[in-house]
Amino acid sequence: MPAPPSTLLQSWNRNAQAWIEAIRTGAIESRLTVTDQAILLAVLGRQPERVLDLGCGEGWLLRELEKRAINAVGVDGDATLVEATRAAGSSPVHLATYEELAETTVNIGSHYDLICANFALLHQDIIPLLAAMNALLVPGGALVIQTLHPWTAAAGDYQDGWREERFAGFKGQWQPMPWYFRTLSSWLNALDMAGFQLVNLQEPQHPQSPVPQSLLLVAESRR
């Protein structure tokens, strides 16, 4: 089921309001118990002064960084999410698609100590985007990615390819969303080709769960 980037963005346009409600009401248990804390600790562990939240969604991570006096900037491709983020916090937030970011046709600032993408890299061709993000980092700056753990999400089909999220078990009105599954080696190859070196790999896990809740990658720019 090939899905162009525009189709993925359209699905976010349709699901934005439901997503805002789900995050702000704490409806996603794995985020409350494991993954929100995992990405926050990974970011704070680098002691950054300036952070870009790539695909910031409704802005929860920006607000957490604001509380800690970190200079944080957000960017997202959906106008509803950007508006919600701006209304709920004071961090600057840019409206830009990943294609615009990859082609460097928009200015979202530079000299970031760290760029994070929390469950925000769902399209197929991520290498141009990651390479563009690399150029926005200070020398030796870090990229922190949290994503679905490929060994958990594979569902018996461990190969790169498009999947469909139907939001089963979520409250509210949701439309199915395409997303691109990639294996662990595919993630590592993408980082390497975009000019990054992996320095840390984590598998956040709930103590009562037999499987990891996510995959968390920390990579440094080779510039």
Q: Predicted segment positions?
A:
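A short SAM/SAH-binding and catalytic strip from SAM-dependent methyltransferases
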Residues: 114-127
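Short alpha-helix
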Residues: 178-201
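A short acidic, Gly/Pro-enriched loop at the edge of an enzyme's catalytic core
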Residues: 104-115
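A short glycine-rich, Lys/Arg-flanked "PGG" loop and its adjoining helix->strand segment in the class I
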Residues: 128-142
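Class I SAM-dependent methyltransferase SAM/SAH-binding core
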Residues: 52, 58-103
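Conserved class I S-adenosyl-L-methionine
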Residues: 1-46, 61, 144-170
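Core SAM-dependent methyltransferase catalytic element
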Residues: 209-223
